[in-house]
A protein has these predicted regions:
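Alpha/beta-hydrolase active-site loop
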Residues: 149-155, 178-201
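Fungal secretory targeting signals
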Residues: 1-29, 458
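Short, surface-exposed "cap/lid" segments of acyl-processing enzymes
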Residues: 97-158, 170-172
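Accessory cap/linker subdomain of secreted extracellular hydrolases
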Residues: 42, 244-343
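C-terminal catalytic histidine-bearing segment of alpha/beta-hydrolase fold enzymes
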Residues: 333-334, 351, 360, 367-458
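Primarily recognizes the serine-hydrolase "nucleophile elbow" in alpha/beta-hydrolase
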Residues: 193-265
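Catalytic-loop region of hydrolases
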Residues: 17-116, 437
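Short beta-strand/loop motif that positions the catalytic acidic residue
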Residues: 346, 351-358
Length: 458
């Protein structure tokens, strides 16, 4: 789906790249060290036996990340550079899965220089995998291996440069339950609760201004959190949520990407649902053809980039004894429907940005979602971008999202009604253009070793 995102994020620094003849001249590439322990083998991630005794958002344990937070190289993406933060933390906290069972997951807390501890952005990274070892808490670390997540650190750095504390939840939970979106939304909300409970550890205020941001798979968690907030976490006020590349309907995507370069989303999504719903697991066991079962289950061992490469162009409908199973079976359709967007109206103001040429999820479905939100009384600024597709809008839409989030953080944006615009490029938005030069300069300086964060406290 966004398999080239790391390379595309490097476009943020194109204005500076002519000065670089190789990565050796940019910052300090940390010497190789032992990779961080995989979450599947790391006792920190282990759920306690008395999990039910913890309230949602309660912190179970905490630590600094085993390895420094890192960003992918701009020219050679296999290289990684340390992100010079004031502090970083991992919190294991209690949340609730899609079946209303107690579970726990990890929150990464990133603190910039001159942080404003009363402004917190919850950033929902692209995970899109049924493998716990792909979680952002692991993938953000040095020597965790190439990933989309380390490309997204560039976006996170842009937020940190505003002085905001950024929190990044492992919203797919301890089993990698990709597409179990009630879990994802609740994990986001409980991550905010955990952040508010972490003052003695992280310095975060008890009642900070909170915003959300996510793209593609991250937009699912972001919008589900916004939908569930009034009922699941009414005390958690959200000043605004920015969501790009929204995916309102799961079954549509499963059918649309079959046989394309994004076909790897199918086994990852089906296996992710199986990790939450036993009936989906039973369907896989019964209907995946024996000669394809080992290959299908490879998705449980790989992350997004691996799945994209492994299954690119393959017709996954031919892996099962009923070609319509993956997107027409009544059980799959029912469970997928339970995890579609558009079930509750968000109270938080929304920025939704979507490519009209989105090749993963049709723009018409996001049009319908926004229309439904607005009819339910939500406040949505909706930007339809004519110049991009699903992948490229992840990059070109980021400056506008950042500018909008800054307005929400500062209480400057007082939009009270829905507004839809079809534009050539959201990158040409006045707010995006105003913020872009500083974003580019900060990103360049961060890569060459500047401490991340504003020079003065705002």
């Amino acid at each position: 789906m966004i398999s080239t995102m790391i390379c595309q994020l490097a476009l943020w620094l194109t204005l500076f790249s002519w000065t670089i003849s190789g990565d050796a001249g940019v910052g300090a590439v940390l010497e190789a060290r032992a990779p961080p322990p995989l979450p599947s083998a790391d006792g920190f991630y282990k759920l306690p036996d008395n999990l039910d005794s913890y309230a949602p958002g309660a912190i179970i344990r905490h630590r600094p990340p085993p390895n420094p937070i890192a960003v992918a190289g701009l020219i050679h993406s296999q290289n990684q550079y340390p992100v010079h933060l004031d502090a970083s933390y991992q919190l294991l906290y209690r949340t609730t899965d899609s079946l209303n069972n107690a579970t726990a997951t990890v929150l990464t807390v990133l603190v910039p220089r001159n942080a404003n501890f009363n402004k917190v952005l919850s950033y929902q990274a692209v995970d899109d995998a049924s493998n716990i070892n792909c979680a952002p808490s692991y993938a953000f670390q040095l020597d965790s291996g190439p990933s989309v997540a380390q490309g997204e650190v560039l976006l996170v750095e842009a937020a940190l440069e505003q002085g905001w504390v950024v929190i990044v939840p492992d919203y797919l939970g301890p089993k990698g339950a990709f597409l179990a979106n009630a879990l994802a939304g609740q994990a986001v909300l409980d991550g905010i609760r955990a952040a508010r409970n972490s003052g003695a550890i992280t310095g975060i205020g008890k009642n900070p201004t909170v915003t959300l941001w996510g793209y593609s798979g991250g937009s699912l968690a972001t919008l589900f959190a916004a939908e569930l907030q009034p009922s699941y976490a009414p005390e958690v006020a959200i000043a605004g949520a920015a969501a790009g590349g929204a995916v309102p309907n799961i079954t549509t995507v499963l059918g649309k990407v079959d046989g394309t370069g994004a076909a790897g989303l199918i086994p990852a999504g089906i296996l992710g649902l199986a990790h939450q719903y036993p009936e989906v697991d039973a369907l896989i066991q019964k209907h995946v053809l024996p000669q394809h079962k080992d290959e299908f289950y490879k998705a449980d061992k790989m992350c997004l980039l691996g799945n994209i490469n492994e299954f690119s162009g393959k017709n996954l409908s031919q892996f099962v004894d009923d070609p319509s199973l993956l997107y027409a079976n009544p059980t799959v359709v029912r469970i997928a429907g339970e995890n579609d967007l558009g079930q509750h109206a968000p109270k938080a103001p929304l920025l939704v940005y979507k490519a009209t040429k989105d090749e993963v999820s049709p723009v018409a479905e996001t049009d319908a979602l926004v229309d439904w939100y607005c009819k339910q009384g939500a406040t949505v600024q909706y930007l339809r971008d004519e110049s991009t597709n699903h992948e490229s809008l992840a990059v070109t839409g980021a400056p506008k999202a950042l500018a909008w989030l800054r307005g929400r953080m500062n209480g400057e944006d007082h939009q009270t009604a829905c507004e839809t615009k079809t534009v050539y490029s959201v990158l040409l938005d006045f707010g995006a253009l105003a913020i872009l030069p500083k974003v580019l300069l900060d990103a360049f300086l961060d890569v060459i070793g500047k401490r991340v964060g504003p020079f003065i406290k705002w």
